Design a protein with these regions (language model features):
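Basic/aromatic-enriched alpha-helical hairpins
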Residues: 43-47, 62-120, 134-140, 293
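Basic, Lys/Arg- and aromatic-enriched nucleic-acid-binding interface segment
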Residues: 10, 121-127, 140, 144-212, ...
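Short, basic (Lys/Arg/His-rich) helix/loop patches that form interaction surfaces
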Residues: 98, 176-199, 208, 243, ...
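A short, charged, amphipathic alpha-helix used as a generic interaction element across diverse proteins
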Residues: 29-45
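Well-ordered beta-strand positions in beta-sheet-rich domains
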Residues: 24-27, 163, 229, 240-244
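Short, Arg/Lys-rich segments that mark the N-terminal edge of DNA/RNA- and chromatin-recognition modules
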Residues: 1-29
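Catalytic-site neighborhood detector that most strongly recognizes the C-terminal catalytic loop/helix
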Residues: 165, 231-238, 250, 281-282, ...
Length: 368
């Protein structure tokens, strides 16, 4: 039996009691909404399609996102990335401050439109995927009985695949900016990167087309400098992969600053531990700072030489572009697409089209 009572000046309290079922109650601003809710619950009870929504009415989206981030995310391979996406979602109080029962496709669409003013459609789509995953898990595992609104939300159009390549001059300035600064007696550093791992990491990325996560997870026990291979037991797509190392890649690994030396001063081969003992956050920040230094150096050199700077020099360059650049260079050496996929780790050969972008001037030379 349903009951509606007025609470204060602006609230209506609705209750539904039925033997054999838990009591249901909810507060509304308008009496009409309370009456509609009572009819819905009573209809569900009559048809035995009753859904207990008390947990959904009690929890906000923020509470569910935080619980998921703490309990589920840490067990995933992409834990760090997913956790960052959840942090971004939690910043939108207009969405995550709502109760789970109040999250409709309209509310998600409003959030989508706000977010599209800040980031690309691809980024928004990935954040929408996280929302959908959290809704499904909460409903199936935690008894949060609400419909997932995501299937009703129109997805933003995907941005065109990136085809940003580094020019030879851009690469030269970037690598120079990644060269380590020297610590002074007063604790300050001369101009350059403070993190000694950034330069060799970027150089190896440009030589092997390995992903950022693969490079950071690379262990010395999986590196064979004599056979010139680097084994990756766990990659993004879940498959193990052994990456062939060029002579340049081997030289980069041999020159790493952490390689211990014998009493005679000669470096010995490492057999265990992380090849690049740094973090994804340190790499992201260090790479961004190096881009800024490289641009400043370039502009200063152009001014000194009295020449006009190239527009867009090192603009819109991200670390993942090193994989694109490396794959494009490898495509020039490996004409067999299967060989190329074995190096880069692409299971879908069509994906390699994103990375094979020969320069027009290079193709012109081949044409004669």
């Amino acid at each position: 039996m349903g009951q509606i009572t007025k609470r204060g000046e602006y609230q209506w309290r609705a209750k539904v009691r039925r033997k054999g079922f838990p009591e249901q109650s909810r507060t509304f601003t308008y009496k009409e909404d309370a009456e509609k809710w009572v009819r819905t619950v009573e209809s569900e009870l009559e048809t035995k399609g009753f859904i207990d929504r008390r947990e959904a009415e009690k929890n906000t989206l923020a509470a569910i996102l935080k619980r998921y981030q703490q309990e589920i995310t840490p067990g995933k391979k992409s834990a760090a990335i997913e956790s960052v996406k959840i942090d971004v979602l939690l910043r939108d109080a207009a969405l995550v401050g709502l109760k789970m029962t109040a999250i409709t496709s309209t509310e998600v669409a409003r959030w989508r439109d706000r977010r599209l003013k800040e980031v690309t459609g691809g980024t928004v789509n990935r954040e929408i995927d996280v929302l959908s995953t959290v809704f499904n898990h909460a409903r199936r595992e935690w008894g949060i009985h609400v419909e997932n609104p995501i299937p009703l939300v129109k997805r933003p159009e995907k941005a065109r695949a990136r085809d940003r390549r580094l020019s030879h001059e851009e690469e030269s300035y970037l690598l120079a900016a990644l060269t380590g600064g020297v610590r002074q007696q007063d604790g300050t550093f001369t101009k350059g990167a403070r993190n000694p791992w950034l330069l060799p990491l970027v150089r190896l990325a440009l030589e092997t087309a390995m992903r950022r996560g693969e490079l950071l997870a690379l262990q010395w026990e999986n590196v064979d400098l004599k056979r010139r291979t680097a084994h990756l037991p766990d990659t993004k797509n879940g498959d193990a992969r052994t990456v062939p190392l060029s002579t340049t890649a081997v030289s980069i690994l041999k020159e790493l600053p952490s390689r211990p030396k014998t009493e005679r001063g000669k470096p010995v081969e490492r057999v265990a531990g992380s090849v690049f003992p740094t973090t994804a956050m340190a790499l992201r920040k260090g790479f961004a700072r190096a881009i800024e230094r490289a641009q400043q150096d370039y502009l200063a050199d152009c001014k000194a030489a009295r020449r006009r700077p190239q527009p867009g020099f090192l603009s819109d360059v991200h670390f993942h572009d090193t994989r694109h650049e490396a794959a494009s260079r490898l495509a020039e050496k490996l004409s067999n697409v299967l060989e190329l996929s074995a190096v880069t780790g692409h299971r879908d050969l069509r994906m390699l089209k994103r990375y094979y972008h020969p320069r027009a001037e290079d193709l012109a030379k081949k044409l004669g």
